[in-house]
């Protein structure tokens, strides 16, 4: 696992040489928080147009997941009602999307410890066949950005291009 400290400026960054499937993918990772009630950014990309994506824990300890913000409108955002305050446990998160799906709620799915999260205070889905910035040939970063540095542990981050998978695949 990797350990990140809020007081450090350490981060990971990867820019892909070419974009992959920008409509369908899955990201799975294990996370253990060590600092609560702080704004924390796990992933962020700033694109020249001002768009970005990320997974962010807010000061009220809910998660805010956004796939694409084009500078004026969200193209996929889920903000949990559930809080994540257990600093002694690892959480397994799976974020899976497929914008080719005809049903909006099938285009973006979020799982916590093997169970699909279905209660959100904000719930918007990408348009059908929307290209997203995840898996584009731009900087993909962990622990970077304006939302605040992450304090905790991150393990087994897996990105699957071209498939919308559920937690049983990991």
Regions found by a protein language model. Give the residues of each.
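Extracellular glycan-recognition modules
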Residues: 7-66, 101-104, 163-168
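Extracellular glycan-interaction patches encoded by glycine-rich segments
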Residues: 68, 131-154
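Short surface loop/edge beta-strand patches of beta-sandwich-type extracellular domains
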Residues: 5-24, 75-85, 144-146
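Solvent-exposed, conformationally flexible loop/turn segments
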Residues: 86-88, 124-129
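Short tryptophan-centered beta-strand motifs in secreted/extracellular beta-sheet-rich domains
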Residues: 27-29, 88-99, 110
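Extended recognition patches within non-cytosolic domains
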Residues: 1, 7-8, 102-104, 109, ...
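Short, aromatic/His-centered strand-loop micro-motif at the edge of beta-sheets
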Residues: 66-92
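Surface-exposed loop/edge segments in extracytoplasmic proteins
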Residues: 50-53, 72-78, 115-121
